[in-house]
């Protein structure tokens, strides 16, 4: 599978990883706040 622009693929992969990281932090923050306030 050859990509015409591998640099663009890398950028999209990094953006996806960033979104997953933010989502993970968001979920952990919700769980942590529920653990504290309960």
UniProtKB/Swiss-Prot annotation:
UniProt cross-references to InterPro entries, sorted A to Z: PSII_PsbL, PSII_PsbL_sf
Bilayer-spanning residue ranges: 17-37
Keyword check for Hydrolase: no
Keyword Transmembrane helix applies: yes
Alphabetized UniProt keyword annotations: Chloroplast, Membrane, Photosynthesis, Photosystem II, Plastid, Reaction center, Thylakoid, Transmembrane, Transmembrane helix
Subcellular location(s) per record: Plastid, Chloroplast thylakoid membrane
A GO-annotated cellular component: photosystem II reaction center
Entries under SUPFAM superfamilies matching the protein: Photosystem II reaction center protein L, PsbL (SSF161017)
Mode of membrane association: Single-pass membrane protein
Domain of life per record: Eukaryota
BP GO annotations: photosynthesis
HAMAP family reported for this sequence: PSII_PsbL
Family statement: Belongs to the PsbL family.
Subunit structure: PSII is composed of 1 copy each of membrane proteins PsbA, PsbB, PsbC, PsbD, PsbE, PsbF, PsbH, PsbI, PsbJ, PsbK, PsbL, PsbM, PsbT, PsbX, PsbY, PsbZ, Psb30/Ycf12, at least 3 peripheral proteins of the oxygen-evolving complex and a large number of cofactors. It forms dimeric complexes.
Role: One of the components of the core complex of photosystem II (PSII). PSII is a light-driven water:plastoquinone oxidoreductase that uses light energy to abstract electrons from H(2)O, generating O(2) and a proton gradient subsequently used for ATP formation. It consists of a core antenna complex that captures photons, and an electron transfer chain that converts photonic excitation into a charge separation. This subunit is found at the monomer-monomer interface and is required for correct PSII assembly and/or dimerization.
Name the record gives this protein: Photosystem II reaction center protein L
Organism: Chlorokybus atmophyticus
Lineage: Eukaryota, Viridiplantae, Streptophyta, Chlorokybophyceae, Chlorokybales
